């Protein structure tokens, strides 16, 4: 079966991500008007390269928190007589609110604040004065953009960010705003899919275990008798050991007594029942639970000799020929537990 991955623009809940961005940064309201700074006599280069790095924590598909560093660029005040420069950078903390448009594309906004540092300098040949000052402060940050999941772990974003009132004109001579359009890439940690929970294989059905034992009646009993002989007791002792070793779950045993066809059918039926019961009584006395074993007389049914003795007329010879029909069969049936080895 092939694995199917669904990309999501937002990272998984309760995971971290980190990335960087690069873009076009532009200052607005850039004139010098305070603390001895004065306007230049040439063009002002108010757009520069901006860059940043950020890290975040995704709470759920709609909410995350980000912290980042931004270099907002250096603005040059050009002039052949009077010139100067202004630059700013800062650390920001924002809440990121997102909403999915498709499975792999989100729109989002970020709202928060930036702790910034602003530096300015001026060289004024017209007055023979040079100035250099810096200032720090906090300004609100607003940003909006779209984020696209390239892979499960990698996402890109296109964003426009606005920082209001950077610097104090009374200190650094100006108080510009900054807008930055950037393209960012982030790596999301912990996006691996959890291992699927494999349901354990159902326990195999127990196997039915059946075993047959056949004992010659001539070993167990004297001819035409139902009392066990000493040799018969020894044979049953050996049988008991085998039955004890089997130990099938929910096992039971049926003792079937058979006779030959000599004598009346009714007599043979009665004799087979007595012989079967004698075997049961002996095995119960040895320790087999009485509820687990039963006796059944089968009379002269199911002969194993077939018609092989049909032409035997002498009684003694017929008794010998029909000896295989005189038997006791024990059928043990139960359930055997099937043990499967766990797969590595």
Swiss-Prot record:
Periplasmic membrane side: 1-14, 60-62, 101-104, 150-153, 189-344
Keyword terms: Cell outer membrane, Conjugation, Disulfide bond, Ion transport, Membrane, Porin, Repeat, Signal, Transmembrane, Transmembrane beta strand, Transport
Listed PROSITE patterns: OMPA_1, OMPA_2
Ranges that cross the membrane: 15-24, 50-59, 63-71, 90-100, 105-114, 140-149, 154-162, 180-188
Membrane topology: Multi-pass membrane protein
Site annotation Part of salt bridge gating mechanism: residues: 66, 157
Sequence repeat segments: 199-200, 201-202, 203-204, 205-206
All ranges on the Extracellular side of the membrane: 25-49, 72-89, 115-139, 163-179
Region (4 X 2 AA tandem repeats of A-P): 199-206
CDD domains cross-referenced by the UniProt entry: OmpA_C-like
Entry keyword annotation includes Oxidoreductase: no
Disulfide linkage: 309-321
UniProt remark on domains: The extracellular loops are most variable in sequence, and in some bacteria confer sensitivity to phage and/or colicins.
Identification of the protein by name: Outer membrane protein A
